[in-house]
Regions:
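Sec-dependent N-terminal signal peptides
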Residues: 4-13
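N-terminal signal peptide c-region/cleavage motif recognized by signal peptidases
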Residues: 14-18
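Short acidic, Pro/Gly- and aromatic-enriched capping/linker segments at domain boundaries
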Residues: 20-25, 257-277
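Polysaccharide-binding surfaces and accessory modules of carbohydrate-active proteins
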Residues: 21-28, 33-36, 44-254, 270
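Glycine-rich, histidine-containing beta strand-loop boundary motifs that form or position
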Residues: 32, 39, 152, 165-168, ...
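Short Pro-Gly-centered flexible turn/kink motifs
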Residues: 99-106, 274-293
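Terminal connector regions
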Residues: 142, 286-320, 327
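Aromatic-lined carbohydrate-binding/catalytic grooves of carbohydrate-active enzymes
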Residues: 314-453
C-alpha cells in the first residue's frame, strides 16, 4: 500500500505544481509602449497589458483576473468560436470535418531584431487543441516611433478545406473607467467629420461593406481616450489604431459586464468566407497601434513618424504643390485651356500640374460621366497633339506632370464594355450593378489584370 501511495502522492504534487506554475511572459515593447501577453500552463494565451512601457513585465506572470472563464469573458489574445468564449470571436471557422469549435493553445514564441535595428518582430505560435489548424500572431515593434503592428497567419494542416468565416487582424482588451471613442465619418464634399462617442456596455461597430475601397463614410481608424469623457490633443491617455486595408473592414468595440473593452479590428466578416485548402496559409491585414500619455496629438504624431519612416513610399520626400484641372475645367477643355492653367500654376510657384478626368475616349468621348470610362486612348478632338505635347509644355514651365486614371472602372457606354462584357463583375443571371454610371472590372481575371497593369 505504501508503494502505491508514493507514486500517487508524487503525481498529485506534480499536478499541483503544474497548475500553480507561473505564466510565460511575452514582452513586446518600444521606447515608451509595452504590449504584454502571457501563456498559461494550460496553453491559453492572454493579453495582459497595452499602454505605457513596463520595464519589468515579469510580475504579470502571476496576474489573476477577476473575470471568470465560465463567463466566457477572459482576455484571450485571439479568441475563437468554441470552448468558453461567448463574445464575438476574432476567429470563426468550420473545420474540414464540419466541427465549428476552435480552441487555440500556445506552442512557442520567439522575438528577433530585424536588419533595421529599430524594428523587432515577435511571433506567437498557437494550434487548435483538437484540429490541425495553426495560428501565428505576428507583432512588429518600432522602437522610436512607439508603434506596434500586428496580424494573424492561419495555416490549414487538416485533410480537407477549412472555411474561414471571421478572421480579424487583432483582438485587444483594455481596462479603464471610461472610453471615449473618436473616429471620422462623412460624405461627398463633407469628408472627415469628427465624431466623439462615450462607449457604454454593449457593442458599437465602425465598418464598411463597400467592397474594394475604404470610404469617406467611415474610416478604418480610431482614437480611444481612456479614463475621461473629454477629448484633448495635449493631455490624457490615448490609444490610436488604424487598419492597413483597402477593402471591407470592421472595427468592433464591446464593453462587457466587467467594464473591459475589447477591440476587434480587421476585414469585415460580411460576405467574406474564405476556403482555405490543405497546406495553404491565410494572412490577415495589418493592424497598427500606438499609445500616448500626451493626448490625441501625441498618438497622431507617433503615427505620422511611423508613416514617414515605414508606411508611406518615399515618406520623407517633399510632396509637390499642384494644380489639378478638375475643379477649373471639369470635362470641358482643350490644349489652349490646359496651357493657360499650366501658365497660371507656374506663375503662382506651384510645382506640378495634374490632368484629371476627360482626356480619353474617341468613339464614346469622355465629355461627361456617362461615357468613355475604360477607353484609355487620348481624345483626338480635345488634344490633337496628344498628351506628350501637354506634358512637355508643363516641363518647359518648370512643372512636373501628372495624369488621372480610374483603371478598375468602366462605363456601360464604352468600347471596353462592348468588346469585353465578360470582364464586368456581375452576379449570375442578374444585371451588373451600376453606380455613378459605372461598372466594376473583375480584377481577379488575369486578362483584366494585364489590361489594367
Amino acid at each position: 500500500m505504501k508503494k502505491l501511495l508514493i507514486p500517487l502522492i508524487a503525481a498529485f504534487a506534480a499536478n499541483t505544481v503544474s497548475a500553480a506554475a507561473p505564466q510565460q511572459v511575452i514582452d513586446i515593447s518600444t521606447d515608451k509602449v509595452s504590449m504584454v501577453l502571457t501563456a498559461a500552463p494550460g496553453g491559453e494565451v492572454y493579453f495582459r497589458h497595452f499602454g505605457g512601457r513596463i520595464d519589468d513585465p515579469a510580475p504579470l506572470a502571476d496576474y489573476k483576473s477577476n473575470r471568470r472563464s465560465d463567463h466566457g469573458t477572459e482576455d484571450l489574445a485571439y479568441p475563437a468560436t468554441g470552448g468558453r468564449n461567448f463574445r464575438e470571436p476574432a476567429l470563426r471557422v468550420t473545420h474540414a470535418d464540419g466541427d465549428m469549435n476552435t480552441e487555440l493553445r500556445y506552442v512557442s514564441h520567439a522575438s528577433k531584431q530585424l536588419s533595421d535595428k529599430n524594428v523587432t518582430e515577435t511571433v506567437v505560435k498557437m494550434t487548435d487543441c483538437c484540429q490541425a489548424l495553426d495560428v501565428e500572431l505576428v507583432f512588429t515593434a518600432y522602437a522610436r516611433e512607439n508603434v506596434i503592428t500586428t496580424h494573424a497567419v492561419i495555416r490549414n494542416r487538416e485533410k480537407g478545406p477549412v472555411t474561414l468565416h471571421s478572421f480579424y487582424s487583432s483582438s485587444l482588451p483594455l481596462k479603464a473607467d471610461k472610453y471615449l471613442l473618436t473616429h471620422l465619418y462623412g460624405a461627398w464634399a463633407r469628408e472627415a467629420q469628427v465624431d466623439h462617442t462615450l462607449l457604454t456596455h454593449g457593442s458599437k461597430s465602425i465598418e464598411s461593406t463597400r467592397e474594394v475601397r475604404t470610404t469617406h463614410t467611415e474610416n478604418p481608424a480610431f482614437l480611444l481616450t481612456l479614463n475621461s469623457d473629454s477629448f484633448s490633443e495635449t493631455c490624457g491617455e490615448v490609444i490610436a489604431g488604424a487598419l492597413a486595408w483597402s477593402g471591407n473592414f470592421r472595427l468592433n468595440f464591446e464593453v462587457d459586464e466587467f467594464d473591459v473593452l475589447t477591440v476587434l479590428a480587421g476585414a469585415n466578416p460580411n460576405a467574406s468566407e474564405y476556403r482555405l485548402r490543405p497546406g495553404e496559409t491565410f494572412t490577415t491585414p495589418e493592424m497598427i497601434y500606438t499609445h500616448s500619455f500626451c493626448g490625441a496629438g501625441g498618438a497622431s504624431r507617433n503615427l505620422h513618424d511611423w508613416a514617414r519612416n515605414y508606411g508611406v513610399y518615399h515618406g520623407h520626400e517633399a510632396v509637390p504643390t499642384l494644380l489639378n484641372s478638375w475643379e477649373g475645367a471639369y470635362f470641358k477643355f482643350d490644349a489652349k485651356v490646359l496651357k493657360q492653367m499650366i501658365d497660371d500654376a507656374a506663375s503662382m510657384g506651384l510645382e506640378m500640374f495634374v490632368l484629371d478626368d476627360g482626356w480619353f475616349g474617341n468613339k464614346y468621348p469622355r465629355n461627361n460621366s456617362n461615357a468613355g470610362l475604360g477607353d484609355w486612348q487620348v481624345n483626338a478632338a480635345k488634344l490633337p497633339e496628344g498628351i506628350d505635347h501637354i506634358a512637355s509644355y508643363a516641363h518647359s514651365k518648370g512643372l512636373k506632370f501628372g495624369i488621372w486614371i480610374e483603371p478598375e472602372m468602366v462605363n456601360p457606354k464604352s468600347e471596353l464594355a462592348e468588346k469585353h462584357p465578360d470582364w464586368i463583375v456581375r452576379p449570375p443571371k442578374r444585371e451588373a450593378p451600376t453606380t455613378r454610371n459605372q461598372w466594376l472590372l473583375d480584377l481577379t481575371n488575369p486578362k483584366v489584370q494585364d489590361f489594367v497593369f
